[in-house]
């Protein structure tokens, strides 16, 4: 159910941005969803009509794109997309300690507006 609260926050952020730009309507928005977030894009699509009802985003086209997990090995600096998390192993040195670079955020990437 956290997809609904996430969608409400994204709609609110897009609404604020559109209002600052003097928009009359938001026609499309793009959301990036990291694989580690636990957010299912199918539920974002499901909840978008309800979350956007009565806002500038009502009737807009939603696009969700996945962001794969990307890490940097803390031992050798190699950047890679692990096969699994946890349990990732650097393909270069075999160590498991890594810094996550991408894949753990939900981001409002773009909105298209009508002025």
Regions found by a protein language model. Give the residues of each.
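Long, charged N-terminal interaction/targeting segments
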Residues: 1-63
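Cys/His-rich microdomains that often coordinate metals
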Residues: 79-80, 97
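Short Cys/His-rich "knuckle" micro-motifs
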Residues: 83-86, 100-104
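Short cysteine-rich clusters marking metal-coordination/redox-active sites
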Residues: 73-76, 90-93
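Structured, basic alpha/beta domains of bacterial-type, RNA-associated proteins
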Residues: 66-70
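Short aromatic-glycine motifs in intrinsically disordered, low-complexity regions
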Residues: 17-21, 92-100
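Long, charge-rich boundary regions
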Residues: 2-4, 30, 106-115
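Cys/His-enriched microdomains
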Residues: 71, 88, 106
């Amino acid at each position: 159910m956290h997809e609904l609260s996430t969608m409400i926050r994204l709609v609110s952020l897009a609404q604020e941005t559109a209002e600052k730009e003097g928009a009359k309507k938001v026609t499309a928005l793009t959301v990036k969803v990291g694989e580690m977030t636990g957010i299912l894009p199918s539920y974002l699509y499901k909840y978008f009509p309800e979350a956007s009802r009565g806002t500038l985003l009502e009737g807009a086209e939603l696009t969700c794109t996945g962001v794969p997990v990307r890490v940097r090995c803390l031992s050798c600096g190699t950047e890679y997309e692990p096969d699994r998390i946890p349990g990732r192993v650097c393909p270069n040195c075999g160590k498991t300690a890594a810094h996550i670079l991408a894949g753990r955020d939900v981001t409002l990437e773009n909105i298209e507006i009508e002025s």
